[in-house]
Amino acid sequence: MTKYTNADELKSLTLGQKTEYKHSYEPELLQAVPRSLNRDDLALGDELPFVGCDVWTLYELSWLNQNGLPQVAIGDVVLPATSPNLVESKSFKLYLNSFNQTKFSSWEDVTSTLIKDLSVCAGEEVMVNIHPVQAYSQQPIVDMQGECIDNQDIVIDSYEFDANYLESSTSEKMVNEVLHSHLLKSNCLITNQPDWGSVEINYEGNKIDHEKLLRYLISFRQHNEFHEQCVERIYTDIMKFCSPKSLTVFARYTRRGGLDINPFRSSHLIKPEHNLRLARQ
């Protein structure tokens, strides 16, 4: 359990509560969670040790055109890591559902509405693009870059989070290495529902022991935090224990409620070069 599980800022969230689905546009459904909750726990100050963003995919986006004809689209949202708030995912789903029986004059009107409302919730301007389903169907399914570290012949007997797996985990050999794992699993901070993800770690520096890194990632298995918070924890722990010259951590989570969240944190890159789906997405 994280130190901020019972924070006042979390008590009013619709997450974990029985809720009524709205069918007409209602921006007030969006709920913000201060990023400071997790960052204070990580002892991060105003000068963040990373840049990056949260990339959301909206698979259940529908509204009515001026003739009442339903429209459907798939949306991409890029939320800056510098925003004071993250958007709580259940409230995001409820907000999108409120579009279902609402008439919009154009696709551009939908896009501008999403940008306006999400920017207010996040506290910083977000980027939004929506795509016809036919156009999005051309996007390939890919694997993460680099070497997969999952197929190691090791015994795992602990699933409690422990950053100390990374202690003394580097050698003197200097490398520029890309690693990934599909074994990332954590639990929702509020509901304890499992969150399934894959994570890619791209770094330059002293070589990180693959076994210790995998044990560290597996230790998230019973850990309760939001997706974005887990990725920031991974980034800060690797920086603390391994001290790479450069580091990028990119996780892609499976969708829930028609949304997937893909947090990206880097020492030098604002956003991922490509936003491509994995097999489980």
From Swiss-Prot:
Pfam family, one: QueF
Binding site for NADPH: 89-90, 256-257
Cellular compartments annotated: Cytoplasm
Molecular function terms from GO: preQ1 synthase activity
Enzyme Commission code: 1.7.1.13
Residues binding substrate, per UniProt: 87-89, 227-228
A single cellular component GO annotation: cytoplasm
Signal sequence, renumbered to the chain: none
Keywords on record: Cytoplasm, NADP, Oxidoreductase, Queuosine biosynthesis
Active site residues of this protein: 188, 195
GO biological process annotation, one example: queuosine biosynthetic process
Top-rank taxon, per record: Bacteria
UniProt keyword annotation of Ubl conjugation present: no
Cited InterPro entries: GTP-CH-I_C/QueF, NADPH_dep_7-cyano-7-deazaG_red, QueF, QueF_N, QueF_type2
Top EC class for this record: oxidoreductase
Catalysed transformations (reactions): 7-aminomethyl-7-carbaguanine + 2 NADP(+) = 7-cyano-7-deazaguanine + 2 NADPH + 3 H(+)
Function per UniProt: Catalyzes the NADPH-dependent reduction of 7-cyano-7-deazaguanine (preQ0) to 7-aminomethyl-7-deazaguanine (preQ1).
Family, similarity comment: Belongs to the GTP cyclohydrolase I family. QueF type 2 subfamily.
The protein's assembly and partners: Homodimer.
Protein name: NADPH-dependent 7-cyano-7-deazaguanine reductase
Protein's organism: Aliivibrio salmonicida (strain LFI1238)
Name of the coding gene: queF
